Amino acid sequence: MSRIGNKVIVIPAGVSVEVNGATVTVKGPKGELVRSFNENITLDIAENEITVKRPNDTKEMKMLHGTTRALLANMVEGVSTGFSKALEMIGVGYRAQLQGTKLVLSVGKSHQDEVEAPENIKFVVATPTSIVVEGISKEAVGQTAAYIRSRRSPEPYKGKGIRYVGEYVRRKEGKTGK
């Protein structure tokens, strides 16, 4: 059984956490995140530590306990250091470029795909074939990176497409001719 909910969250210097009923606001050097949690879960803030407590040991409360603690820890980490996901483009003519806050992808289609940056998300294009998605919300960074990847997922025969850096793409053998 997981014991994640019992771990204490350490608040780094420069980060403030405010609890207003079931709503938690976390402010830090990179920005501010607001999220609502279940009102049965209590948060105890003492000096530079947050402790998440549940009222009883029912299955639902145990699930919410660990989830709440993990989400809160991600909020604290996001406003202090931030999150990033790196993607790479493999394929002839596949390239990415920035136009303002928009990411324009050329991935072998008859048109270019444009991806608008959501709130608190920034795109970094160091080379035409590498994209880095940065932001303070782990959830938003992951969803945006997954959306960019879905514009042209890696195919199993030649491996062409957009993939996460370090992602293993299972390759298949092509047809054998007569």
From Swiss-Prot:
Entry-linked InterPro entries: Ribosomal_uL6-like, Ribosomal_uL6-like_a/b-dom_sf, Ribosomal_uL6_a/b-dom, Ribosomal_uL6_bac-type, Ribosomal_uL6_CS
Family annotation (Gene3D superfamilies): Ribosomal protein L6, alpha-beta domain (3.90.930.12)
Residues spanning the signal sequence: none
Keywords, comma-separated and alphabetical: Ribonucleoprotein, Ribosomal protein, RNA-binding, rRNA-binding
UniProt keyword ATP-binding present: no
Gene Ontology process terms (BP): cytoplasmic translation
GO cellular component, one term: cytosolic large ribosomal subunit
Sequence similarity: Belongs to the universal ribosomal protein uL6 family.
Annotated protein name in UniProt: Large ribosomal subunit protein uL6
Biological source species: Lactococcus lactis subsp. lactis (strain IL1403)
Gene name, Swiss-Prot/TrEMBL: rplF
